[in-house]
Amino acid sequence: MVCKGCGTNCQCSAQKCGDNCACNKDCQCVCKNGPKDQCCSNK
């Protein structure tokens, strides 16, 4: 599952996950632009 909230505009602070990571707690997904907390939302 990819980060749906911001599509390809997602990055993960955990290096092992890379960009457009799965929405995993270990990946700490955030949006590069816009509301960071919406990266892993289902909207």
UniProtKB/Swiss-Prot annotation:
The keyword Hydrolase does not apply. The modification Blocked amino end (Met) is found at residue 1. InterPro entries: Metalthion_5 (IPR000966). One of its GO terms (biological process) is cellular detoxification of metal ion. Induction: Strongly induced by cadmium, copper and mercury. Coiled coil: none annotated. It comes from the Eukaryota. Belongs to the metallothionein superfamily. Type 5 family. This is Metallothionein-2. It comes from Drosophila melanogaster. The gene is MtnB.
